[in-house]
Amino acid sequence: MPKTFFITTAIDYTNSPPHIGHAYEKVLADVIARYRRLKGDKVFFLTGVDQHGQKVQQSAAKAGVPPAEFVKEITQKFVDLWEKLDVKYDEWAETTSERHKKVVQGILQRLFDAGQIYKDKQTGYYSVRQEQFLTDKERGPDGQFGPEWGQVEFREEENYYFKLSQHKEWLLQYLDNRKDAVIPDFRQTELRNAVEKLGGDLCISRPKSRLDWGIELPFDKDFVNYVWFDALTNYISFAGYDPSQSTLSSQPSTFRDKWPALQIIGKDILVPAHGIYWLIMLHAIGFPDDQMPQLLVHGWWNLGGAKMSKSAGNIVDPFVIVDKYGAEPVRLYLTGAIATGEDADFSEERLLRYYNTWLANGLGNLVSRTLSMVHRYLGGRLSRIQSKQSTKLASSWLNSIEQGVLTGETFSYSEDFDETPYDKVFSLPKFQVHKAVGLIIETIAKCDRAIEESAPWQLAKDPTNAEELARILYNLTEVIRVIAIWISPVMPKTAHGIFDQLNWKMELSEKEERFSLADAEWGRLPDGHVVGKPKPLFPRIETDKGV
């Protein structure tokens, strides 16, 4: 039985409402999850919120409300945004849940009993942002701590520590042996360089006298767990992990069926959180090398070349953007206008151009124009006419359409979907979602050029061209159907809207609302199929109204 495709995102910290960067990560994960469902895979998509920690306690105090009440309100904002953006997760993680607390405490007790956790006093410089003590290894060439550490202050405190440094050589060897542990590969190089500099152990507690909003240590009631063993553990606690079982083979089948996961994170939490702390934590509790998660690291959406931040006042509110342009155009822009793993500048002007160029004038116009011609010249009924020229199928109709010749052969492709360009760009190991979006956009543009070159309106003037006209309009309608399936992971409601206008229901899907890549096989629109009437999919937005 095939394993479940398990995909996670970072859980979002509930000290402030979501911004466009949160939206990008979740939409990216949702698109990949939908693509795997499209291929017929069973998928488990986990996301959620991190509700504990010093910043939450401070923000709640500033707001004059208890932490539990504060995080409940912020949590709801994230839930509302994912609903608004049509992000369909299978499990929701909240770190205040009892289920999660039991797993965290179980893991901590196991590590404490194994001598992996010890108590010690520490004096030194402390990063308020990263909530950790720093060493000289974190200093830059100028001897100062870099801006990534935020406010740094001198502290003395007794706490519990995890023997992180003991596992340094293991992590280096693991990264050397597995070349795709981190995607893209330059991030793996970045991680390995950071591991080389790894020195001390990891503080995993805070005294309750300073922080009481957290999970109590099972072996010392005067301390709460520090953020890492709380936040990072969600990836397994909400997937069914049992901390009482010391080996992976003895875990419940519900967990073994899912693990390992593809974990989508931002570049700012690769080092040290996920690339060092998380991988070493898993190794310490018995996860073998071949069961380590794969880390897909995305870049940032900047604004005017600068990182978005509340303090700089340059945050893009995703609620406002979605209300203005719609969820599906925003999903298309967020996944199409940034290369996976790289940074990009968020621009509302560019989003508007995306909408008008590729949706209003592109896909929407292609559907409307084609179906209007089918009704005008064929009475709304398609005729599937085989080409007289050749019966040999092209391996990729995308390469042939460049010529602007719309024949049955041009729009056919290999029966092996692993050989189609669409499937390649979505599949392991790169997850190049932006290239899949680009392929769809390119196909729409080629269809428009092909219509102009074949000029169905001219063919319709001569009855002797009836077969050629019918063949062209069938192929155009069929490629629109294929595009709808291709675009469904990014724009599911748009895909359904196109199917409604085509008057077509998916044949191979288990449920009507579930798309199947097998349905993209060429020629599924039968001879004599009657299409629906065209309706505007994306009304054009005038520039002065959009921005």
What residue spans do the PLM features occupy?
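Active-site rim elements
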Residues: 94, 264-268, 469-470
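Helix-loop segments that flank and shape redox-cofactor active sites
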Residues: 255-264, 426-431, 456-459
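A glycine-rich phosphate-binding loop feature that marks nucleotide/adenosyl-phosphate handling sites
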Residues: 125-130, 297-300, 349-350, 384-391, ...
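Extended, non-catalytic structural segments that build the interaction scaffolds
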Residues: 159, 345-359, 400-408, 413, ...
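Basic, alpha-helical terminal appendages of large translation-related enzymes
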Residues: 1-4, 18, 44, 48, ...
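Conserved, charged catalytic cores of large soluble enzymes
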Residues: 1-14, 31-204, 241, 245-254, ...
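Structured secondary-structure scaffolds
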Residues: 2-40, 44-47, 99-103, 147-376, ...
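Amphipathic alpha-helical segments within well-ordered protein domains
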Residues: 319, 423, 484-485
